[in-house]
Regions:
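Metal-dependent nuclease catalytic cores that hydrolyze phosphodiester bonds in DNA/RNA
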Residues: 1-124, 225-231, 243, 247
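Metal-dependent nuclease catalytic regions and adjoining charged, substrate-binding loops involved
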Residues: 83, 90, 154-156, 166-249
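Mg2+/Mn2+-dependent nuclease catalytic core
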Residues: 104-105, 109-205
Length: 249
């Protein structure tokens, strides 16, 4: 049985695919496999912790988060400036009745299911049973992002639409998927964003096309491809040839 305590365990990470894990495999198969098997741990940045601080508040697990992350405090026991900013973001969000309405669902609901025969697990931030799935996201800003030479909406750049497709498929009732979004700007912006069903359908088809390969990689049936760009690939890189500098982009 998957619980909040063992949701991210190595055992469950091997047994189930998740939205974050799927996206990690899309970025770098070798790095994702190393994480799943416990051979590599991605660095936790201050920016990530600020987002996690806001998440923990709405999950009602902030005290536990603070206990697990003493680095967010100064030697005097005060919150560091970045987390005071997180407190301000929280205060701003709680002033908005519409934002809070969508964040008022059942918190951190764990569900398991299958996508094209591959086991998946999800954890929903705010679940309104029979009505809507809501995912909380805190980011730098709402501006489009350059990716692979194209300027695309941040929802697509960060794969939030892919996560929504996975959540909807595993939940199983074809519920609308919304993003409760907030920014880390000096004056936080906020929005409730919908992801159209045709986009979710497109993303789900992509998941179905890729997920069997990723599952086979986890089972050791296929050798993972290295991206040679991520921190994992840099940390395990072995030089085998001299490279013309003009080929380095």
């Amino acid at each position: 049985m998957i619980t909040a305590e063992n949701y991210f365990s190595l055992e469950n990470s091997m047994a189930y695919m998740g939205a974050g894990q799927y996206k990690a495999f899309c970025e770098c198969e070798a790095g994702a496999l190393a994480e799943v098997t416990g051979n590599y741990e991605r660095e936790t940045t201050v920016s990530m912790l600020v987002g996690s601080y806001v998440d923990a508040h709405f999950e009602k697990t902030l005290d536990l988060f603070k206990a697990k992350h003493p680095e967010i405090f100064t030697q005097k026991g005060e919150l560091r400036s970045e987390y005071k900013r997180a407190e301000y973001i929280i205060e701003r969000l709680e002033r908005d009745s519409m934002f809070m309405k969508y964040m008022s669902g059942e918190k951190q609901v764990i569900k398991i299911g299958e996508i094209d025969g591959v086991p998946f697990k999800i954890k929903i931030d705010s679940y309104h049973a029979g009505k809507v799935i809501v995912d909380l996201k805190v980011m730098r800003d709402f501006e489009p992002i350059w990716k692979d030479g194209l300027k695309i909406p941040f929802v697509e750049a960060w794969g939030y639409d892919i996560g929504g497709a996975i959540y909807q498929a595993v939940e199983g009732n074809n519920l609308p998927f919304l993003i409760s979004a907030a920014t880390k700007e000096s004056e936080p912006d906020l929005s409730i964003l919908s992801v159209p069903q045709d986009r979710l359908d497109f993303c789900l088809n992509q998941v179905k096309e890729n997920v069997h390969r990723f599952a086979d990689i986890k089972r050791g049936l296929i050798e993972p491809i290295r991206c040679e760009r991520c921190d994992y690939c840099k940390s395990t890189k072995i030089l085998t040839e001299i490279v013309d500098y003009r080929l380095i982009a």
